[in-house]
Amino acid sequence: MKINVTIKGITPIIMNRFTEENEVSVTGGTSAVQIGDKGTPRAQAEKKRYADKEGNLYIPGPNIFACLINAGKFHKVGKSKVTTQKSSLIPAGITVEEIVVPMSNGNGGKPQWEVDSRSVVIPSTGGRIMCHRPRVDEWGAKFSLDVDTEMFQPNFVRKLMDDAGKKVGLCDYRPERKGPFGRFVVTGWEEE
């Protein structure tokens, strides 16, 4: 069964795309970030946007899929949780059809982004640095779910999607990561 879903953000969303520059620093190489000018806060944030070549913002489909999987922690099938720390039943019965989910401003228009600057803790060192990331205050998206109804009924998938928006969230500093950003509500639900 195909379900067309429309979501609207109830809190701003913060993006933090993993760039090639980040990969170099993680794998032990050197990068411009380590050895030279980092650029303006806006230039730093611009590199972290999920945006296509025309500059249109999007949410990666795998991010929405991971959000659904993590929402499974709040649901049980029989005596077992749908998602545990090591496994989940969600991938066997639900998929997000789009690889790239275009964002809107929640009203059908193009979303605008601002620079969100705040300190972050580097887990490996415990040190603090300033991080400049893109923040979209008004946002929404439309995507499709392919659901195996032998595994999951549409009303269960709706509860899962509602919990994903309230308790898990999307992108950086979301509720699942002890933050307030990336929360959403389902505003459209069409079963085909």
Set out the residue ranges of the language-model regions.
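RNA-interacting cores
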Residues: M1-E192
